[in-house]
Amino acid sequence: LTPALERTLGVERSRPAGPRLRGRGGVTSYFGRRKNPFGPGVEFHDGLDFSAPYGAPVYATGAGVVVQAGWMGVYGLAVVVDHARGYRTLYGHLSRLAVRPGQRVARGGLLGYVGSTGRSTGPHLHYGVYRYGTPVDPRAYLDPTWYTR
C-alpha cells in the first residue's frame, strides 16, 4: 500500500463509528437540551444514551488508546478513548471495566460492561464524542438505524 493510502486507512480505523450493543433498546436520551431526569428544568446532555441490559458488553467504536478508565463523577465508571486527530469517545455508567489507561484498543475491542453507575436512572450506555475537547452530536458518526425514533 502507498503511504497516503496507509494514512487514510488509519484515519478510518480510528474514526468513531458508533456503538454496537447486544440487546439494545434504542436511544433513550439524545444530544442537546433535555428535561432534567432528576428534577425540574432542562439541562444540556453531551451524548446519546442507549438502553441496554445490565452487563451487556461495550465495545470501542474506533481504534485508539485508553486515556481514562475509572470513576468519572456523573458518568460513574467510564472509559475515554483517544482516537487521535482530535477525536475522543466516552463510554459511561459501566458496571465493570475491561481496560486500563494506556491500553491500545481496536475498533470492536471490549471496553467494559453496561451498568448504572454515577448519575443514572437505570442500566444504559452513555456514549459521547468529543472533537478537540468539545462535545459533538454522536449521531453524525452513527448509522441512522441506530438512533432513529
Segments and roles (model prediction):
Residues 19-149:
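Catalytic cores of peptidoglycan-degrading enzymes
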